[in-house]
């Protein structure tokens, strides 16, 4: 067998399989009787003339009692040996999956969960989009499809791109900057903690946050500001400033903890390392991690490991987020009208069946993402360049989203998808906004968080300010005074309304002047009104 696999035929064709594909354009298992005789007759002397090979094959046919006649064999020899051979490229359907299943060097027959037809479709959809984006400096892409109920991986296209400079990189496992794909989990955490509701008003206005080495000044994708918007609009339209304000409420520490609970092991630094830019996806994550996190949203907040080995045991799931918050986030991500504030009504995220989806674009357009789910499937797509080169004017909406839509439409060509129903502890209430801030609508709330009446943005809200400490203040403890006796006064201007002090996300009190026992480290102090809106925030340091 080893000899047959190593023997050279007619130049650079080595082995029975190679010569079979080169001469007959098929694998050895698919050869007919006359073709097999001819191939066997090449072994003694592959460089013989077609006539000599045909004579050997005819003698072999006679000895073996073959039905193939000498004339048939001679005609076949003249045809296949008288023309240049051509070996078509053999495209592996899922080489990265094969390497995963055979990891450790064990040679075995392994069954995987992939759907072969779907895998081929996903690869073709990616190749088609990458060909269209080639003129915009886009060479690489990856896509992952999983079953929500079982966690089985149905398609694993880890590296698509004919012009890829890194064809062996697994794009599904490679960490890349997350962009806006983390926002659903941030808002979900704020809703779960009852800091905010889907109808809470957030300011989409210029923001400066003291940070080490200067000020952190986030901007929106289009560098414009919408003013007061609801959380539903802020998430659907992927606004950056409201997301940063929400992280100031939740705290980076709590958000990092939540992301790790969702399986994002790529976040291996302390929360201080990421800071408030984490709201905008400054951290690196993998497509594998993102898809499973979105699958958790689709599964009502329950997380479990994905499965590729068909022979492996089913994974148990564990609750990592409030089921009610997951449902509210799913409702927002499926809201076509709310999304239109940034993307318009007609875009690649609009489907004729129920889906919830989010795009993301990293800094300088080095990566873009589209991750979303239906009732049955979760699909994630990444488009970019493995070396990290920027794309030219390609966002998640124009890069990854069309592939996501193609895959979802293929999955649901004969399968319906319905929105999740209400669960215990969640209520649906009509809401209206004063001054036509947003159109009236019916909104989901965790029971007990629904607003008592019309939602308004009060002018006096803008006047509330933190007077002390000022941004970037450095407070030094007095070594001559016992630490337990030292106090710092937080001073605020409340402008006639009730406000609450929060330090690093923890409630302190609601008096205009509040005494606090200082603790060494960096802190963020926020002033929040009775509707959980952030009126002001400052960062300071205690040494």
Residue ranges and their predicted role:
Residues 112-135, 147, 156-158, 163-174, ...:
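A penicillin-recognizing enzyme superfamily signal
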Residues 136-141, 164-185, 193, 197-205, ...:
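Short active-site loop at a secondary-structure junction
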Residues 1-120, 257-272, 276-281, 295:
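Non-catalytic, structured segments within soluble enzyme domains
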Residues 72-90, 206, 210, 224, ...:
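Soluble, non-transmembrane domains of envelope/secretory-pathway proteins that act on or interact
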